């Protein structure tokens, strides 16, 4: 860091965050100096638009595009069938593909989703991941309490990850910190609205569904600020409410799918 001509991070917001005490881990002074000198820059990661393309993806039940967005619902049925959940088109399906660790906000997810389930909201949760034993067990317990609302696979399966991206309505990423993140970019591509904490690359790639952004038709997902159960729960409620307005929801989905976060775009910033 001292002798580098240039320093890059994987998102602009993370480049700012590492100049603070909270994220700098003792290097915030040096990094702040490099930022003032114009030698610290954040460049958002990109994704492979060929590997992650709902129009050609062989791992999903039914291919679709912006022009054939109705076919996305076939993938929702497929993921409900995979997890032995009732085939309910009007249920808001929340997807989670993640390491089950504190950094990813898994505890917040379990607590907030439990609140919504206890309240009787029409949601379903489908999870794929592995990690800390206590979180794995908490998810198993939640599945046992709500077998018609929660599906859990402990481990990782690439095909299932693609199907969750295609079949979910909302993708959960309530990370405590996230230098860039890729799943929110996959989710945008697949028209699955990311629900994220406003940090790192999540902040740079998701536009919140605020009233103003909905009016301007720039919204692509949902954001919340503080890593607390209450804030995540409030964001979930906003997603549930917007899902009950299908015409507006569809517009947000289309806007999300029209975003381009491919490496072809990101690589230009390195030139």
What kind of feature is each model-predicted range?
Residues 1-271:
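Catalytic cores of nucleotide-sugar-dependent glycosyltransferases that transfer UDP/GDP/TDP-activated
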């Amino acid at each position: 860091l001292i002798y580098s001509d240039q320093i890059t991070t994987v998102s602009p917001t993370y480049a700012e965050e590492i100049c603070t005490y909270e994220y700098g881990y003792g290097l915030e002074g040096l990094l702040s100096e490099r930022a003032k000198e114009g030698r610290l820059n954040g460049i958002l990661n990109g994704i492979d638009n060929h590997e992650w393309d709902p129009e050609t993806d062989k791992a999903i039940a039914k291919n679709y595009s912006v022009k054939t967005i109705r076919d996305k619902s076939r993938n929702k049925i497929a993921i409900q069938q995979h997890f032995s959940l009732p085939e309910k088109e009007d249920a808001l399906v929340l997807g989670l593909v993640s390491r089950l660790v504190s950094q990813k906000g898994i505890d917040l997810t379990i607590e907030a989703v439990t609140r919504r389930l206890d309240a009787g909201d029409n949601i379903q949760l489908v999870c794929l991941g592995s990690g800390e034993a206590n979180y794995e067990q908490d998810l198993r317990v939640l599945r046992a309490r709500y077998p018609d609302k929660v599906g859990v696979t402990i481990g990782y399966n690439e095909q299932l990850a693609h199907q969750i991206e295609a079949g979910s309505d909302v993708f959960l990423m309530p990370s405590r910190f996230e230098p860039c993140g890729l799943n929110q970019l996959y989710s945008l591509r697949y028209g699955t609205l990311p629900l994220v904490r406003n940090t790192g690359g999540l902040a740079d790639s998701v536009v919140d569904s605020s009233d103003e952004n909905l009016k301007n038709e720039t919204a692509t997902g949902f954001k919340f600020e503080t890593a607390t159960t209450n804030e995540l729960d409030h964001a979930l409620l906003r997603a549930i409410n917007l899902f009950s307005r299908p015409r507006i929801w569809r517009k947000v989905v289309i806007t999300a799918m029209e975003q381009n976060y491919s490496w072809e775009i990101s690589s230009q910033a390195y030139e």
